[in-house]
Amino acid sequence: MSKLKGLLLTEGMHGMISQVEGLAKALGIDYIHQKVEINLLAKLLPPKITPISNLFFKKFTVPEIDLVISCGRKSVIPSLYLKKNSTKKIVNIHIQDPKVSLSNFDYVIVPEHDGLNGKNIISSKGALHYLTLKEIEKNHEYLSDKIDKNKQQILLILGGPNKYYKYDKKNMSRIFENIKGLAEKNNLQIIIIPSMRTPADTIDYANKFFGSENLVIQNVDKKAYLSGLSIAKFLVVTCDSTSMISEAALTGKPIYVAQIPSKRDDHRFRQFRDLFSKLNLSLIHI
């Protein structure tokens, strides 16, 4: 029997790609990934009042598919359009709260801390992701020639600014000082890994702040990320990324959450971290 064929729709961010590909791999389907690009008007309109039309996103070639897995606000309208206009019955699955009627999708997968309920809702404890321990260990040696073999490593994984958290120099300086203090106290080498959302000036600042005795990865590098997860004894993830905290939890290592003062009520992020703590996943706030 041939495998089902799926189309994955995201905005191209690491966390979203990780979630749709993680689900696709778990379902055992063949899939291709399509980055969604919406026009200016669609960026201004919330999905619930945006017409289901291909006038609101950049057209792309649609292969023969059995299901669509989408994640993020920008992928909602393309997913609904494909389901509505398909010549065959396709299943559409959306990850995260789509902010439209849930009945538009066959299934909606959301983290438990979002508090959404419905007959087609599937709740997850954290964010879905595509990582496996086998893949992490496979990339162990990628950074091995760049680290100090006489020290253990602590990994700092940087997310990026959003409407809740600001990545200004004041906030980054406090995080960097805390990490540097931990490293010096315990004779650790620091590895810093950025993500797609990490501002360039934050990476530049990290490079200057931590110096040559530590390792700052300058660009988004999946192999470096996986290698760092494998090599490091301690993991630190900025509080803005539920996806990367969920991925780090796979390792079973102690996870430190680098706190950033919130600009607005961040109760969903706090509920997520509280849930992980209740699951004994060793979240330590710094």
Where are these regions (language model features)?
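Conserved small/polar residues in nucleotide/adenosyl-binding loops
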Residues: 284-286
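A donor-sugar binding/catalytic signature common to diverse glycosyltransferases
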Residues: 11-13, 225-268
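A nucleotide-sugar donor-handling region in carbohydrate enzymes
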Residues: 102-168
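Alpha-helical membrane-targeting segments
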Residues: 37-64, 81-85, 268-274
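Catalytic donor nucleotide-activated moiety binding site of glycosyltransferases and closely related
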Residues: 187-222
